[in-house]
From Swiss-Prot:
Co-factor binding details: Binds 2 potassium ions per subunit.
Protein name: Betaine aldehyde dehydrogenase
Cofactor annotation: K(+)
Recorded superkingdom: Bacteria
Amino acid sequence: MRAQPKASHFIDGEYVEDAAGTVIESIYPATGEVIARLYAATPAIVEKAIAAAKRAQPEWAAMSPTARGRILKRAAEIMRERNRELSELETLDTGKPIQETIVADPTSGADSFEFFGGIAPAALNGDYIPLGGDFAYTKRVPLGVCVGIGAWNYPQQIACWKGAPALVAGNSMVFKPSENTPLGALKIAEILIEAGLPKGLYNVVQGDRSTGPLLVNHPDVAKVSLTGSVPTGRKVYEAAAAGLRHVTMELGGKSPLIVFDDADLESAIGGAMLGNFYSTGQVCSNGTRVFVQKKIKQSFLARLKERTDAIVIGDPMDEATQLGPMVSTAQRDKVFSYIEKGKSEGARLVTGGGIPNNVSAEGTYIQPTVFADVTDEMTIAREEIFGPVMCVLDFDDEAEVVARANATEFGLSAGVFTADLTRAHRVVDRLEAGTLWINTYNLCPVEIPFGGSKQSGFGRENSAEALKHYTELKTVYVGMGPVEAPY
């Protein structure tokens, strides 16, 4: 098989196999080919991984942030040196075009290692608090063993986004990738060892829905970081709460992207397409509710159709391909069910909605799809589809669109396109979301915090802010004189 790893799991610095686990077949979405066969972690494998992480963490935490950061920066260098190899693996794992993975996936992971490796000495600090004769100080200390649970849309990126802040803060990690995309995280673990990371600090275990509870409920786990759906998030949160564990969650969204009539039309359409079709629409922060002011609705839709129909769909390994297949048959079928629901509820299909003609019949392809005349109560305007389906809604004025944009249980992201920056800042202040863009969309450099509100989760990935979620504050009071007691 073309992408078979040495073994299913990576624990304590080496590959580990246990064929007693449930079989996981890694399928290349473009052709339906089985490219690797792995095994889900048994309870014994989970125990082995957590034991390794627990054993290795104290010595790692005793190292200086500079020393820890140096190893992460070396891992970033190795990832960049092997960007082509890692990008091709990511394409096999996910079906995303190589045109995309080579600029957005391993490189983003490398950015994370480099960023956190660089800021650790300055960011992992505390405060000095004078108290007259006495004084106090605070320091940030690691939590211990952290569990990362990844999603299938950006497997390598997520493995790094969770691993980098955890490791540089002095923690160890056990990472479980999605069973749909099991391959990339194993390579990340290999590279970290090559970069000099001590054994046991970054472990990868494969698994399905039954594996998560084994990790989350383990008494030696101090922290859980999840990227996934809202239903999964609720289950993980409930389990983690029973053990009073630290939790951060980046969950789903149904984000609004608002286009006012003074916006640059081409830029707004470009932003809407990035926010709906990149990664074949499988991005949690996508702006899938595109609100267009009525004055420009027809011109917006006409040009949007032209540009959408020109998207190149095909073999993900062809660098000319702009849109690849869905990650799995199950996900494609789910998206098709939403398309049918949109039609039946009265939305107007502008373009797409079917299977492209020029692709493998065994691939999980779907055309980029645009619906117009969508109303707020329609299913496709309320539920996260997680596929290349854009819903265009129209609006009259600012107050109306802000109220409608906020009328959702989600709060991950939002975007505003307008030439009036005063209005832009006023609108984003009123939008209920954690990550917002003005006159662009879906740009997430590691320097800025990323995360949501409401049912879209809590906590933040990236930026120095992320380190707060992988450390806790220790306060030390220093008495400088005799102790006075009333007895």
